[in-house]
Amino acid sequence: MINFSSFYQHIAQDERLFHWLDTLPAQLSEWRAHALHGHFASWERMLENLPEITPTELNLKQGVIANKTPALSTGEQLGLTNILKALMPWRKGPFSLYGVNIDTEWRSDWKWDRVLPHLSPLKGRLVLDVGCGSGYHMWRMLGEGADFVVGIDPTQLFLCQFEAVRKLLGNDQRAHLIPVGIEQMPELNAFDTVFSMGVLYHRRSPLDHLWQLKNQLVSGGELVLESLVIDGDEFQCLIPGERYAQMRNVYFIPSAKMLKVWLEKCGFKDVRIVDENVTSLEEQRKTDWMVTDSLEAFLDPLDHTKTVEGYPAPKRAILIATKP
């Protein structure tokens, strides 16, 4: 059964994080007692069925890659594949685990390649990843030398996927996924780097989200913000109707320049737009590990520069900012 005792033990010994123990255990007890997904028990059984494997080769620098010598047999690989496929859909990755290649909907490694050149070095840093999904980028952060990585995401399938990968990486305790939203966190002012990637446009109040991110950073800490944007000057913002690219919960899509103004309005300094990129059909697509509709189905079939609703097709910007 998934439990958070190792995380509690770690933060109890960390003066930057131990105040979180005032609220978190009660929140997670309430979550387990009253808020579990209907499939959660079956997902946990899949975790219990995973083999105990210690990698002899672990590469978190070029990807999330684990291998062992001797290699798994064909039958063992098939058994591992079947367990991991019971945790579908896999959206963020990819993962290469003992010959089983999880080809996720998103090529999250491509996003990481766009982000990485602009980061302050992560070596030795305490990192928070907000809306971390199944945790792909958390492992890449460790690959860049982060000391400890906390991911938060309330989606329970993502928690189970993260715990599956963790078990297959030798039960690595340097990263933990906590199933809460940022609005449930106290203002810790603790993290050296905070990532929020693919979250802002799902927020009814985007400036409140930026303040919440700021309140998790130490003074001098770095925010890495990635979000949907539109073309235009600092006065341009799209407020979609009921759906955007078939997503219901999209509220504000500013231009990158407006997003920079928002960050400055919230008191961040040294705000810079470091990347803008139109999402390609190669970066987000249907795979054997995510078999429902993906980006291609969300775009106008006659004009891929538009969504099916007629809005500009998804474009994403990365901004870096510093808390004074």
UniProtKB/Swiss-Prot annotation:
Alphabetical UniProt keywords: Transferase, tRNA processing
InterPro entries listed in its UniProt record: CmoB, Mo5U34_MeTrfas-like, SAM-dependent_MTases_sf
EC number: 2.5.1.-
SUPFAM superfamilies, per the entry: S-adenosyl-L-methionine-dependent methyltransferases
Catalysed reactions, as listed in the record: carboxy-S-adenosyl-L-methionine + 5-hydroxyuridine(34) in tRNA = 5-carboxymethoxyuridine(34) in tRNA + S-adenosyl-L-homocysteine + H(+)
HAMAP family associated with the record: tRNA_carboxymethyltr_CmoB
Family: Belongs to the class I-like SAM-binding methyltransferase superfamily. CmoB family.
Protein name: tRNA U34 carboxymethyltransferase
Species classification: Bacteria, Pseudomonadati, Pseudomonadota, Gammaproteobacteria, Enterobacterales
Gene that produces this protein: cmoB
